């Protein structure tokens, strides 16, 4: 009944290395896309939000500045959390902001 034992020395190490490299590349690509998407969203929205973020409360609340607002009464404190860029998850609408 020795046939049930496995000999792990016959496993090809090249296939394990190749699998690890593929997984690492996929995870790195996802992280890079998330970071670049978040940075692009900040720069895109920041140019529309300079007057509101400074603290001019008389202006329309969160008109184009949803990522920088709490949507309560205080527009000076930033909202916490990380927004998922829309090009990574195109089918899900997880963001609170309205599309332009």
UniProtKB/Swiss-Prot annotation:
Q: Which InterPro entries does the entry link to?
A: InfluenzaB_glycoprotein_NB
Describe its membrane topology.
Single-pass type III membrane protein
* Coiled coil start-end: none
Q: Give the Virion surface compartment stretches of this protein.
A: 1-18
Q: Which GO terms describe its biological process?
A: proton transmembrane transport
Q: Which GO terms describe its cellular component?
A: host cell membrane; membrane; virion membrane
Read off the Pfam families from this record: NB
Keyword field: Glycoprotein, Hydrogen ion transport, Ion channel, Ion transport, Membrane, Signal-anchor, Transmembrane, Transmembrane helix, Transport, Viral ion channel, Virion
Q: Which residues are glycosylated?
A: 3, 7
Single GO molecular function: channel activity
List where in the cell it is found.
Answer: Virion membrane
- Topological domains on the Intravirion side lie at 41-100
- The UniProt transmembrane annotation reads 19-40
Give the principal location in a single coarse category. Answer: virion
User: What subunit structure does UniProt give?
Assistant: Dimer.
Say which family it is in: Belongs to the influenza viruses type B glycoprotein NB family.
Annotated function: Putative viral proton channel. May play a role in virus entry.
Q: What is this protein called?
A: Glycoprotein NB
The species this protein belongs to is Influenza B virus (strain B/Singapore/222/1979)
- Lineage of this protein's species? Viruses, Riboviria, Orthornavirae, Negarnaviricota, Polyploviricotina
